[in-house]
Every structure is written in C-alpha cells, then in structure tokens.
Amino acid sequence: MWVRDRLDGLWCDEDFAGWYPRDGRPGLSPAQLATVCVLQFVLGLSDRQAAEAVRCRIDFKYAMAMELDDPGFHHSVLADFRDRLAEGGRADRLLDLALARLKAAGLVRERTTQRTDSTYVLAAVRDLTRLELVTEAVRAALEEVAGAAGHLLDGLVDEEWGQRYGRPARLGKNPTRPKTRILATGNDAARLLEHLYRHGTGRAWGRQVQALRQILVQNYYRDGAGRLLWRTGEDDGFGLAPSSRAIVSPYDTSARYARHGHIVSWSGFSAHLTETCAPDGPNVITDVATTAATTHDSRVLPGIHARLRRRGLLPAEHLVDSGYTSLVHLEQAARDHQVTVTGPLPGNPTRQHRRGEGFGRDDFHIDFDRREVTCPQGQVSQGWHGPYPTSSPTAAPLIVARFTMGQCRPCPVRAQCTTSRESARNVGFPPRELRDLQLRVRTEQQTPQWKARYAVRSGVEGTVNEFAHGHGMRHCRYRGQDKTHIQHVLTAIAVNIE
C-alpha cells in the first residue's frame, strides 16, 4: 500500500511500450504483471497462488490499481511475461525503473557509500556424475526428437535402448560395469547424432540435441583408429573441458560447477548484490548481477559500476571484500567513475614475503625515471623490460627488472634473495601509477580509520542471508542464466519495497 500511496506504483504501462508491437489486440497491463511478479517474491507465492491472490485479495487489487470486481488472469500469463523479461536485458530495465521511483522519492541518492558481496546459487537441476550426464543427455535428446519427429527414430531405438534410457539415470558414483557402460553410452550417443544428421537434413534441432552434441565432445574423443574413448584428466591433449565450459546438465547448459576452498562446491551460478549503507538513510539494493559460478568476483566490478552510472547511483566509496579488489579495477573505478573502491588488496606474492624471510620485492628500490632497480646490497639492475600484459584480465601489467649472474653469483646474501643456482634475481612490479596506488592502499589498510570504515561492509552479509533464506534465492526457480537473473532482480525489488 505504501508503494501505491507514496510512489503511485513502481512503473506505468508507458514504461513497457517498447516491449510490445503496436498492432494486435489489447493485452494485459504490463505494469500490473510486473507488480504481481514482485509481490510473488515478497510473499513467496507460486504462479497459481499469485493469480489467485490477484483474483480475491483486496490488497493485491489496491497495489495494482484494479477494480474490485476484476477477475484477474490465468496463471500461465506470468510465465509468458517472464519470457518477455528475459529478452534483451529487460530485467535490468525493470530494476532501473523501480530505482528511479525510489530516487525521486528521496530514498536513495548518488555518491553515498555502497557495499557488494556475492553468494552461490544452486541451479534447478540435480547433481550428476559424468556417466549419468551422458546417459541423461541421450535420454533427453530421445524425448525431444520423439515429440518433434518421432519417425526419425524408426530403426534406431529398440528394446535395449528403452531399458537404458526409458527412465532418468540414477547410477551413483560406483555403477556396475562402469567401463562397459561408458563405452556403450558414448557409442549410443554418437549413433543417435549421426542418425539424426543423416536423416534429418535441413532440420533445426532443439536444445537437447545440441546439448547432447556438446556433452559428447566434452566427455569423449576419437583416437587415430577412429575408436570412441573416454576423456580423463591425464589424457595428453584430450583432457577434460575446463569448468568454465563444462556442461553439468542437459537441461540447463548455462549452469557451471565451481568450488570455493575445500568446503563449498555447487553447480549453478553466482549472485552479486550491491546495496547502499549510508548511516542517514535506508539500505536499498541498487544492483544485482548473475554470473556463471566460475566467474571471478573481480571481473564483475566494472559491470556493476557501469550499471550504477546508468542509473545515476554511483557511490563515492564502494566497500568490497578481497575477491573484488585488484589494482587494475581500483585504478579504473577511480579514473572512469570517481569511485573509491575499499577492500583488502592482496599482499606481496613473492616467496620471500610469504615465508617472512629473505629479500622481498618491497626491499628493492625502484627508480622509474632512470628505469632501474637497486637491490639491498647496492647492485643496480642491468635490464628493464615491459610492461608485459598478463594472462589474467584482473592482474596488472608487469615490468620486469633483471640482474646478471655476475652481480648475483658473488653476493654474500644470495641465499636470502634467490634459490636458483642457474639464474640471477628478477624483480616484477606494476607500472608507476599502479605501483603508487598499491603502496598507498596497503599503507592505508593498516590504519584504524580504514578498518573502522571497512567494518561497515560486513552488514551486506545480512542482506545476502535475507535473499538466500528469506526469499529462497539460494535455489533457482527457473532454468537458464537469463531466467535466474529475472528471479534475482524481482527478489531485489521485493526486498526494496518490504
């Protein structure tokens, strides 16, 4: 009721004009459908329950500005509206509109303090072993082809195939005759695909057939004699696909397997939540991002800032944990958006620094003007190379200063500098601007003022807990990353208006 009384709704039909064609018969109000979708996540309702609430609950009718005798609509309309939301980033547009209303009401403003954290999200699929994955992919493809063009399976599917693929695969981690099953299932998958492409020329195959093709390639390969073999981690040149590409279920090919440490592992996605945390105002969710489970947190930060800039809600200070901090992104946020990213910067990665003995990188004096490095014993480097780009998009470019064997071999403290007997010491460091930023941030992190400011970040973990356990965000309602993102956006709007 507060949303209707104070904001006159979060959106109006004109906000959705670009989503619909100009001709055709009139449809249901998209503003009302969007409101119902949000109320679903406020109260944890299914589509049927939400449609029933629209029909008979007066508070729903008031929130949607409906007449009391309005009969509502069929529950399947909500699924159709979500399909429309999944197109072209429209879910983010829905959040933009809601935040614009809150900003106009003075509930959220630009250049305050915001904080971000992430959590894991479980896909709406069950965990499968690799053998179960291939078996289930064959079964799903057979079901899809049988429904679309069943005559193509004539002469291929027999009683033995019916016994193998008639029911969902539940083989466990230690099935009987595993090697026989692996080869038989792989050969069945290859035969099925060859049969379909031979007899279904020109036909556009559905998602399950395409998923089977990818799963077959990721789990099998053919040797020089043309035999189909099972991929293992030890195969030279024929190993397993990386987790960022490996499909874990034929029913959701966007879900990925990830592991954090030795405790948390899951198949699904990651959700990144950003909220305001100014002491003189309410906490408002300003951004939600849904990524593959294997996407590193630091790669999400530029996208968060770009969306906040579009909404006119960039923070002055952005509190994040160590997963989001990198020299490149700290410098980029300050340069492009005038945002101070506050979070623990990773320490010096050299072996000497980790062990707390010997000469680490910080013990060398770097002279950028003269392009030389002086070691603790007074020797001056003889080479200055780079900056070189690094393989990681989150790592800073690297300059390498090299010393010679003539300098290092007679050094009395060589053992404290390098363990190599065949080469001299090399020192790597980022360019001057990033190096100055690195030293300044590491110094600030040790001050009580910085620690007091950063302590506010921990509050976002309570918001994550509310999302995950209070609104069921831990488990996907829908399949596919786009639909999962819709769930996260609707949950964010629901949390904002509660």
Regions inferred by a protein language model and the residue ranges of each:
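Basic, low-complexity segments
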Residues: 1-23
